[in-house]
């Protein structure tokens, strides 16, 4: 692959973090939105479902457009859409208008994920690409948690409208900056229009292993984002925790994720543990965390405990799960597309759209089972974790079958 320009790592970071940080800032204000529009919390939570569906549509379409017209113009277009939709959200007079605006916002911000990854592959190769991802990983885990912290303070001292004002300002700064210095990294613009997009699409649709990987990634990310859309109602509304303090609690999950990342690196590099075994360890952490979460949630439903103890009973199991999340997801993303090395960009956009639909489905389930306790959500987490383990077992069987055919 010919490299015509290199995008700096910090510019990649800004692209990568924009979507998850947008969502974690926003979810801190869900109880406030519910009171403002005088609606049920489950309806407010569905704005996140629309967000992830919009993200899936954006990944599928904007990723393809960047192959045809170049990375730079589509990134700028996506940021412009993000800004306009954030401004519309400020003036939303009902929840339906906000839902539409959130869908459009996610469509625009999806450039950060799909095109950010494409620009990284355009700019770096081999060990250099691995190094760039390695130095960005801690920040990718830390900054979204910082989003909850920022969102908590905005909600506590201002109102939910200022969350979207913040998004508008951040998007405007990025758009102005990227308009000046964002390089074009796609060398194959002239050749992309003849790429076999639909041929790849048809192959992926029939690939059982890819669908199983997509389910695992979608389920684990669904648990993560589902927690952020359910926890504010439990902690802020039911337990009367201040939004700013809730934002600080989100750092606990971030620290667990960072620990999981370092543990994965230690197991692979220092202990020479092969990838599939590290994934198995990740599933064990997740399953243990989700079982403990389910047990704790039912204890909290029937036994009155102090807020401090209740918070520990909610966050400790999720921290255990997040260690497993970090051990698992990066390796899963690597193996999912190993058979699509020559069409990584196209396959990646289709694969990303699939697992974001899974995330949207999980968040929809969270909204449908929303209640005054967290026990329903904890059971959903347990079901998703067990289902992911079963999916991984089936993947291992498919690998064995594949190796037998080759030999």
From Swiss-Prot:
Keywords: Cell inner membrane, Cell membrane, Membrane, Transmembrane, Transmembrane helix, Transport. The chain crosses the membrane at residues 3-23, 43-63, 73-93, 95-115, 135-155, 162-182, 209-229, 248-268, 277-297, 308-330, 346-366, 379-399. CDD domains: MFS_MdfA_MDR_like. One of its GO terms (biological process) is xenobiotic detoxification by transmembrane export across the plasma membrane. InterPro entries: Efflux_drug-R_Bcr/CmlA, MFS, MFS_dom, MFS_trans_sf, Sugar_transporter_CS. It is a multi-pass membrane protein. It is found in: Cell inner membrane. One of its GO terms (molecular function) is xenobiotic transmembrane transporter activity. It holds the Pfam family MFS_1. PANTHER family: MAJOR FACILITATOR SUPERFAMILY, MAJOR FACILITATOR SUPERFAMILY (MFS) TRANSPORTER-RELATED. This is Uncharacterized transporter RP603.
């Amino acid at each position: 692959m010919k490299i015509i320009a290199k995008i700096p790592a910090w510019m990649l970071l800004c692209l990568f973090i924009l979507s998850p940080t947008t969502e974690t800032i926003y979810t801190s204000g869900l109880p406030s939105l519910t009171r403002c529009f005088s609606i049920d919390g489950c309806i407010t939570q569905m704005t996140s479902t629309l967000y992830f569906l919009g993200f899936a549509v954006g990944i599928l379409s904007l990723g393809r457009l960047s192959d045809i017209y170049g990375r730079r113009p589509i990134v700028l277009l996506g940021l412009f859409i993000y800004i306009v939709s954030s401004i519309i959200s400020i003036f939303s007079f009902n929840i339906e208008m906000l839902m539409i605006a959130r869908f459009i916002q996610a469509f625009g911000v999806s450039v950060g994920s799909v095109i950010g990854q494409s620009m990284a592959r355009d700019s770096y190769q081999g060990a250099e690409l691995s190094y760039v991802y390695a130095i960005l990983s801690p920040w990718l885990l830390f900054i979204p948690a910082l989003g909850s912290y920022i969102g908590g303070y905005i909600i506590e001292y201002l109102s939910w409208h200022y969350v979207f004002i913040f998004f508008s300002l951040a998007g405007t700064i990025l758009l102005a900056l990227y308009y000046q210095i964002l390089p074009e990294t796609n060398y194959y613009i002239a050749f992309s229009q003849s790429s076999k997009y639909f041929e790849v699409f048809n192959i992926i649709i029939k690939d059982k292993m890819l669908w199983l990987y997509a389910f695992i990634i979608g389920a684990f990310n669904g648990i993560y984002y589902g927690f952020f859309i359910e926890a504010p109602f439990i902690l802020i509304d039911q337990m009367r925790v201040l939004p700013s303090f809730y934002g600080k609690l989100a750092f606990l999950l971030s620290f667990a994720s960072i620990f999981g990342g370092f543990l994965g690196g230690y197991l692979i590099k220092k202990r020479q543990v092969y990838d599939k075994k590290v994934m198995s360890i990740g599933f064990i952490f997740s399953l243990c965390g989700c079982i403990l979460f389910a047990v704790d949630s039912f204890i909290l439903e029937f036994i009155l405990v102090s807020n401090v103890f209740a918070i520990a009973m909610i966050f400790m199991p999720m921290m255990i799960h997040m260690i497993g999340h970090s051990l698992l997801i990066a390796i899963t993303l690597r193996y999912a597309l190993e058979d699509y090395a020559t069409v990584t960009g196209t396959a990646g956009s289709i694969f990303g759209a699939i697992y974001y639909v899974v995330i949207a489905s999980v968040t929809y389930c969270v909204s449908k089972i929303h209640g005054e306790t967290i026990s329903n959500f904890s059971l959903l987490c347990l079901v998703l974790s067990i289902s992911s383990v079963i999916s991984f077992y089936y993947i291992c069987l498919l690998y064995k079958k594949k190796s037998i055919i080759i030999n």
